[in-house]
C-alpha cells in the first residue's frame, strides 16, 4: 500500500447549511486526486467508534452494480402508462423502519472520473460504458469477479455506477463498521483492475442486454435520433449506450477491444481527473488516513480535463424531425443550443428562463395552451444529464405533451412560444422573480432533507467536477448575483434559426421514412417553411392572455420549530397518536422531535362512496379525480415552486391526498384545495381532453414487459381488479352527463384517515382536521361500505402458468415472473417477514451471479419478497431479449432447486454476516422526515398500526437460525411440499413462439382467462 501523504487538507471550507451537523474536509493527494471527507456524527450516535471489520469474503456476486445513466432514462411518458391504478401500492418491499434504540446510518463513498462517452473512439462506440462494466470484474488484489459486491451484500450494502458524456461515477453504501473493507475493494477499481479477456465477452452481453431495456423507450429513441442527426464529427454525433453490434462488431472489424479499454483507462483513470467522496462515522483524521493509504497508488496525472473539439452548430437550423413513437403519445420537443454556463452557476440565467417558460400558473404558456385544448403538460429547462449540460454547450429543452388537436397545431404552438419570448424581451428581466428564486433556493438549502448516503456521495462527487470546493453543496441552490444583461444575452439564443424541432407521435406515417441505425426507429426530416421562420423571428403581437406570473403566495416566512426539547433520546420518542377517532375521520399525529426542520407531511386517505363498485364507477371516479387535478393545477404548481408539494392519486375506492413541505402554508393550501373540490363540476372541453388523455394512458398500459408481468400477476391475485382493456372499452361510452350525475353520489359519504407528522403542534393538526369538517359537509361512510381487497388463496400444490404475448409487437424482451405464495400476515407477528427478508438477503447475489453474470440470461435478474394487501409472497424475475420464457423458467427452476444446497453449505460466519446485515438495514435511521413519514403511513394504510414494525422484525431475526431458513425453504419452495404454491407469468417477446409451451404443459394448470380462474377460486379474508 502507498506511503503517500496528502498534499493539502482544508477544514471548514465547504459552505454548508447551519442545520448540517456533518464535518467536511477537502484533501488532495500527491497524485492529484481530490477527496471530500465527511464525518457524520449520526453514523455512530453512541459516540464510540469500534474497530473496523475487514473479512476476505469470497462468495456472492453483483447486486446492482452497473447501469449507465443516459441508458436508463426510462421516465418518459410514465404518467401516461396508466399502470399505477392496477398495481397494488400496498405491495411494497420497503417496510417501516423501526424506531428502535440502535438505529444506524450507512457509510458510503463515490468516485467520479472526468471522462465519459464523448471520448468513445468512433470505431468502438459505447466503450466508456463498457469500461465502467469491466471495472467490476475483479482486480489484482481481489481477483474474484464478485468480490466487491459480495462483500457489500453480506454487510448490508449495495453498489451502482453510471456513465455520462463527460464523467463516470461509481458509488456504494455499506454497514458502518465495514467501510474500510469496502474502500479497500473499491479503491482497486482505480489502481489495478484485471479487465480479463474471458470476462469481456460476458460483459458485452450485459451491455447489450442493458441497451435492449432502452430499445423501445421513446425518450431514449429521441435522444439517439438527436445524436445521429447532429453534425458529423461533432462529439454529440455518437452512440453512447453501446451494444453487441458496436462492441463485438468492432472486434470483428479487427479492433482489439481490450487494448482499447486499457488505453482509455490508462489515459484518463488517473488522480488528476478523479474526485472522491467518503462518508463515515470515523474522525476526519481516520478517514484521511484510509484515503491516503488506499488511493495513494492511483496513477498520477494532470488536472487538465480532456478537451473536445467541436466546430459549428450541433444541429442544422430550420429542420423538423418526425419520429414514430412506440407508445400512443404526441410530444413536441424544442431545443435551443446555449453556450456552456457552468461558470455562471451563481447567476443561473438558464434557471430564470426555465422558471418562466415552464411555469404553469395563470398567464403562462402551459395555461394558455391547455385552455386552447392543445396541450396536457409542458416542461422547460436545461436537463441535468451530461448531454444537456456539457463543456461544449447547454441544451435548453421544452417538451410539450399534445392532444390530438394539438398535434395538428404544431406551428401555431411554436408561434405562441415566440410570442411569449417576445413578451420576456419587452418587459426585460425582472429582479423580483430572481429574488423569489433566490429566497426559495436559500430556504431549500438551509433546510435540505438528508438523502441516502450513497446518493449524497455520488451527487457531491459530481459537484466537485462542476463547482469550486466551497460550493460543492451550495452550488445547486445558490442564486447570488443578479445579472439582467446575461439573461438578455442568453435570450438572444432563443431564435428559430437556433431551434431544433422534434415531433414524437404514434400517428406519424410515411413512405419516406429514414432509419436511425442503432435503435432502428423510423423518422422523417423536413424543412420548416421560410415564411414561418421569419414570422417566428419577429412576432407582430403578443396575445393578451400571456403575461408574467403573479408573486408567489406560498413562499413561507415562519421557520420556527415546534419541538421544545433540543435533544430527544430516540428511546423516548413516541409513535403517532390517534387524536381524532370519529365516524367521519380518524387522525393520527406525531410531532417531529428528530429532524427539527420547518417541514410537515400531511397525508389523507379518503374513502368515497361507491367509487370501486363497478368498472363504470371506477372510471367515473378516475375521470373526476383527473379533472379535479386539472382544475387545481395552477394553485398546486405555484405551491410546488415554494417547495410545498401536492399529490392526488386513486387506490381502489380511496382518494389519497398528500400535502407536504414547508409547514407554514399547508393550512392555506389545503383550504384552497378543499374549497374547489367541494363544489367543482367539470366542463365539456376539459372533459374531452382528460378523457382522451385517459384513453391514451390505457392504450399505453403494459407496453413494458416487466410492468406487464407484474400487472398479470396482480390481476390473478386481486379479487377485484378491472382490466385495462375493459376500462378502455367502457370509457369510450362515458359522457359528461354520466359524470355530472355520478359526482353528487360520490361525494355524499366519505371517510378520512390521516397522518399529520412534522413541525406541527397538536392544535395545528386539529385545525387541519377542522378544515376538512368545515369544507366537506357530508355524511360519514360506514365501514361496511368501504372496499377491502381480497387476495386469491392458491390451492395446495398449485403450479399455475399464465402466458401472454408482449403488447408492443416490436418488443424483443421476454419476461418470466415466478411468484410463490407464502401466507397472510399474522396479527402482531413479524416472523414470516423476517424469514422472507433473510432468505432474500442470502440468495439475491447467488441468483444474480448464476443467471446474469455466468449464464447471461439478460440484464434484469432479480428476486424479492412481495406483500400484496398483507399476503406474503416471493418473486423471481428475469427479462431477456436473448432467450424465450420456457428456457428462462427452466433456468430459474434449476436455481431454486439448488438453493437447498446453497443454504446447507453456508457456514455459520457467513450466515451471521447476512443476518446482521439484514438487522442493520432494518434499524437504519430514517435519513429524512419524509422517509419517516412514509414508513409510518404504510402502517396506517395497511391497517397494521405497528409503528415499531422493523424494530420488532430485527428482534425476531436474532432468534432465526439457519435451520429455520432451510425448513422454511423446504415448506414453501420444494415442489413435493403441499405448501409449495406458485404462479409463473410468462410474457413472450416478439421473436419467440408460444407454441413452445405445448411441450411444456406437464403437471401445470394453464390459466387462459383470469376472470374464469378467479370465479372458481377461494380468497383470503380482507386485511386492509
Curated annotation (Swiss-Prot):
Q: Where is this region: Disordered?
A: 41-103
Q: Name one GO molecular function term.
A: metal ion binding
Q: Which residues bind Zn(2+)?
A: 129, 133, 210
Where is it found, in Gene Ontology cellular component terms? cytosol
Q: Where is the composition biased (Acidic residues)?
A: 52-95
What are the positions of the active site? 132 (proton acceptor), 203
**Which class of enzymes does this protein belong to?**
hydrolase
* Record flagged with keyword Ribosomal protein: no
Give the record's keywords alphabetically. Hydrolase, Metal-binding, Metalloprotease, Protease, Zinc
- What InterPro entries does its record include? Metalloenz_LuxS/M16, Pept_M16_N, Pept_M16_Zn_BS, Peptidase_M16, Peptidase_M16_C, Peptidase_M16_M, PqqF-like_C_4
Recorded family membership: Belongs to the peptidase M16 family.
According to UniProt, the name of this protein is: Nardilysin-like
Q: Which organism is it from?
A: Arabidopsis thaliana (Mouse-ear cress)
Amino acid at each position: 500500500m502507498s506511503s503517500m501523504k496528502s498534499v493539502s487538507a482544508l477544514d471548514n471550507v465547504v459552505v454548508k447549511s447551519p442545520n448540517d451537523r456533518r464535518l467536511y474536509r477537502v484533501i488532495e493527494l500527491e497524485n492529484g486526486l481530490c477527496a471530500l471527507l465527511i464525518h457524520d456524527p449520526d453514523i455512530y450516535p453512541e459516540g464510540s467508534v469500534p474497530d473496523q471489520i475487514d473479512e476476505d469474503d469470497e462468495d456472492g456476486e453483483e447486486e446492482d452494480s452497473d447501469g449507465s445513466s443516459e441508458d436508463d432514462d426510462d421516465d418518459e411518458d410514465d404518467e401516461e402508462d396508466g399502470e399505477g391504478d392496477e398495481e397494488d401500492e400496498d405491495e411494497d418491499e420497503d417496510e417501516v423502519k423501526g424506531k428502535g434504540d440502535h438505529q444506524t446510518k450507512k457509510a458510503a463513498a463515490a468516485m467520479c472520473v472526468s471522462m465519459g462517452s464523448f471520448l468513445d473512439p468512433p470505431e468502438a462506440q459505447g466503450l466508456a460504458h463498457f469500461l465502467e462494466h469491466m471495472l467490476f470484474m475483479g482486480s489484482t488484489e481481489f481477483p474474484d469477479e464478485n468480490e466487491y459486491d459480495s462483500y457489500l451484500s453480506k454487510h448490508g450494502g449495495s453498489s451502482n455506477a453510471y456513465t455520462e458524456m463527460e464523467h463516470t461515477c461509481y458509488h456504494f453504501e455499506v454497514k458502518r463498521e465495514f467501510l474500510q473493507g469496502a474502500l479497500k475493494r473499491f479503491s482497486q477499481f482505480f489502481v489495478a483492475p484485471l479487465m480479463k479477456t474471458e470476462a469481456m465477452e460476458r460483459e458485452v452481453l450485459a451491455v447489450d442486454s442493458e441497451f435492449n431495456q432502452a430499445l423501445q423507450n421513446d425518450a431514449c429513441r429521441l435522444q439517439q435520433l438527436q445524436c445521429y442527426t447532429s453534425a458529423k464529427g461533432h462529439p454529440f454525433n455518437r452512440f453512447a449506450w453501446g451494444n453487441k453490434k458496436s462492441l463485438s462488431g468492432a472486434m470483428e472489424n479487427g479492433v482489439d477491444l481490450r487494448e482499447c479499454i486499457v488505453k482509455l483507462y490508462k489515459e484518463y483513470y488517473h488522480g488528476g481527473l478523479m474526485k472522491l467522496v467518503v462518508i463515515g462515522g470515523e474522525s476526519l483524521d481516520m478517514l484521511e488516513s484510509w484515503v491516503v493509504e488506499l488511493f495513494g497508488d492511483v496513477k498520477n496525472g494532470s488536472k487538465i480535463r480532456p478537451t473536445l473539439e467541436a466546430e459549428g452548430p450541433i444541429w442544422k437550423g430550420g429542420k423538423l424531425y418526425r419520429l414514430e413513437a412506440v407508445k400512443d403519445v404526441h410530444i413536441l420537443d424544442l431545443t435551443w443550443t446555449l453556450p456552456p454556463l457552468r461558470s455562471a452557476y451563481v447567476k443561473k440565467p438558464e434557471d430564470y428562463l426555465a422558471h418562466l417558460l415552464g411555469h404553469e400558473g395563470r398567464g403562462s404558456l402551459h395555461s394558455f395552451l391547455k385552455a386552447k385544448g392543445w396541450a396536457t403538460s409542458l416542461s422547460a429547462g436545461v436537463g441535468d444529464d451530461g448531454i444537456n449540460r456539457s463543456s461544449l454547450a447547454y441544451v435548453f429543452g421544452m417538451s410539450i405533451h399534445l392532444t390530438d388537436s394539438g398535434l395538428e397545431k404544431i406551428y401555431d404552438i411554436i408561434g405562441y412560444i415566440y410570442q411569449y419570448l417576445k413578451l420576456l424581451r419587452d418587459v426585460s428581466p425582472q429582479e423580483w422573480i430572481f429574488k423569489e428564486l433566490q429566497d426559495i433556493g436559500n430556504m431549500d438549502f438551509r433546510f435540505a432533507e438528508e438523502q441516502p448516503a450513497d446518493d449524497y456521495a455520488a451527487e457531491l462527487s459530481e459537484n466537485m467536477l462542476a463547482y469550486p470546493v466551497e460550493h460543492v453543496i451550495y452550488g445547486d441552490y445558490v442564486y447570488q448575483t443578479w445579472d439582467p444583461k446575461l439573461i438578455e444575452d442568453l435570450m438572444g439564443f432563443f431564435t428559430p434559426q437556433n431551434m431544433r424541432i422534434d415531433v414524437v407521435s404514434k400517428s406519424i406515417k410515411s413512405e419516406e421514412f429514414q432509419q436511425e441505425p442503432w435503435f432502428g426507429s423510423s423518422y422523417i426530416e423536413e424543412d420548416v417553411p421560410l415564411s414561418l421562420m421569419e414570422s417566428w423571428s419577429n412576432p407582430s403581437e403578443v396575445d393578451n392572455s400571456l403575461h408574467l406570473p403573479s408573486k408567489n403566495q406560498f413562499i413561507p416566512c415562519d421557520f420556527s420549530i415546534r419541538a421544545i426539547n433540543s435533544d430527544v433520546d430516540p428511546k423516548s420518542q413516541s409513535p403517532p397518536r390517534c387524536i381524532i377517532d370519529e365516524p367521519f375521520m380518524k387522525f393520527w399525529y406525531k410531532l417531529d422531535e428528530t429532524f427539527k426542520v420547518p417541514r410537515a407531511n400531511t397525508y389523507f386517505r379518503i374513502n368515497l362512496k361507491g367509487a370501486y363498485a363497478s368498472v363504470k364507477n371506477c372510471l367515473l371516479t378516475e375521470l373526476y379525480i383527473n379533472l379535479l387535478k386539472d382544475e387545481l393545477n395552477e394553485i398546486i404548481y405555484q405551491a410546488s415552486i415554494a417547495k410545498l408539494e401536492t399529490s392526488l392519486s386513486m387506490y381502489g375506492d380511496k382518494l389519497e391526498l398528500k400535502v407536504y413541505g414547508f409547514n407554514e402554508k399547508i393550512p392555506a393550501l389545503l383550504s384552497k384545495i378543499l374549497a374547489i373540490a367541494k363544489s367543482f363540476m367539470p366542463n365539456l372541453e376539459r372533459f374531452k381532453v382528460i378523457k382522451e388523455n385517459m384513453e391514451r394512458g390505457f392504450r399505453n398500459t403494459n407496453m413494458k414487459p416487466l410492468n406487464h408481468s407484474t400487472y398479470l400477476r396482480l390481476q390473478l391475485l386481486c379479487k377485484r381488479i378491472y382490466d385495462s382493456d375493459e376500462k378502455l372499452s367502457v370509457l369510450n361510452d362515458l359522457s359528461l352527463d354520466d359524470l355530472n350525475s355520478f359526482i353528487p353520489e360520490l361525494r355524499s359519504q366519505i371517510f378520512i384517515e390521516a397522518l399529520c407528522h412534522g413541525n406541527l403542534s397538536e392544535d395545528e393538526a386539529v385545525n387541519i382536521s377542522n378544515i376538512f369538517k368545515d369544507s366537506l359537509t357530508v355524511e360519514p361512510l360506514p365501514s361496511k361500505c368501504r372496499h377491502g381487497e381480497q387476495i386469491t388463496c392458491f390451492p395446495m400444490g398449485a403450479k399455475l402458468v399464465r402466458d401472454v404475448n408482449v403488447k408492443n409487437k416490436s418488443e424483443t424482451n421476454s419476461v418470466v415472473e415466478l411468484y410463490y405464495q407464502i401466507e397472510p400476515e399474522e396479527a402482531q407477528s413479524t416472523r414470516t417477514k423476517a424469514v422472507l427478508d433473510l432468505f432474500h438477503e442470502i440468495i439475491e447475489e447467488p441468483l444474480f451471479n448464476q443467471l446474469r453474470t455466468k449464464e447471461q440470461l439478460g440484464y434484469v435478474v432479480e428476486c424479492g419478497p412481495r406483500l400484496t394487501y398483507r399476503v406474503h409472497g416471493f418473486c423471481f424475475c428475469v427479462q431477456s431479449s436473448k432467450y424465450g420464457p420456457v428456457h428462462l423458467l427452466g433456468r430459474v427452476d434449476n436455481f431454486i432447486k439448488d438453493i437447498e444446497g446453497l443454504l446447507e453449505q453456508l457456514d455459520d460466519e457467513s450466515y451471521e454476516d447476512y443476518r446482521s446485515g439484514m438487522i442493520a438495514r432494518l434499524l437504519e435511521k430514517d435519513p429524512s422526515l419524509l422517509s419517516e413519514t412514509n414508513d409510518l403511513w404504510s402502517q396506517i394504510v395497511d391497517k397494521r398500526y405497528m409503528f415499531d414494525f422493523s424494530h420488532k422484525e430485527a428482534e425476531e431475526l436474532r432468534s432465526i437460525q439457519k435451520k429455520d431458513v432451510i425448513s422454511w425453504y423446504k415448506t414453501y419452495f420444494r415442489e413435493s411440499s403441499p405448501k409449495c404454491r406458485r404462479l409463473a407469468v410468462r410474457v413472450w417477446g416478439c421473436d419467440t413462439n408460444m407454441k413452445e409451451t405445448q411441450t411444456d404443459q406437464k403437471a401445470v394448470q394453464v390459466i387462459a382467462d383470469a376472470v374464469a380462474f378467479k370465479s372458481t377460486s377461494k380468497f383470503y379474508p380482507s386485511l386492509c
